[in-house]
């Protein structure tokens, strides 16, 4: 039990930093999904695109 507590005390950074990265990536993807729901609702982006024109919301 003492060894487990010592390991946690010594290496907590090695667990929290990757967890923060993974949680940040997950939240970023969810935010992007939420924002794409409003992609064509804005008056600025509602117009028809020219045949050679690319989408602006990549």
Swiss-Prot record:
Record-annotated membrane-spanning stretches: 11-27
Keyword list, A-Z: Electron transport, Membrane, Mitochondrion, Mitochondrion inner membrane, Respiratory chain, Transmembrane, Transmembrane helix, Transport
Membrane topology annotation: Single-pass membrane protein
GO biological process, one term: mitochondrial electron transport, NADH to ubiquinone
GO molecular function ontology, one term from the record: NADH dehydrogenase (ubiquinone) activity
Source domain of life: Eukaryota
Function: Accessory subunit of the mitochondrial membrane respiratory chain NADH dehydrogenase (Complex I) that is believed not to be involved in catalysis. Complex I functions in the transfer of electrons from NADH to the respiratory chain. The immediate electron acceptor for the enzyme is believed to be ubiquinone.
Quaternary structure (record): Complex I is composed of 45 different subunits.
Protein family membership: Belongs to the complex I NDUFB1 subunit family.
Protein name as it appears in the record: NADH dehydrogenase [ubiquinone] 1 beta subcomplex subunit 1
Native source organism of the sequence: Homo sapiens (Human)
Gene giving rise to this polypeptide: NDUFB1
């Amino acid at each position: 039990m003492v060894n487990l507590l010592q390991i946690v005390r010594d290496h907590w950074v090695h667990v929290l930093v990757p967890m923060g990265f993974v949680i940040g990536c997950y939240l970023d993807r969810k935010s992007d999904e939420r924002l794409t729901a409003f992609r064509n609702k804005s008056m600025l982006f509602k117009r028809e695109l020219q045949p050679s024109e690319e989408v602006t919301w990549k």
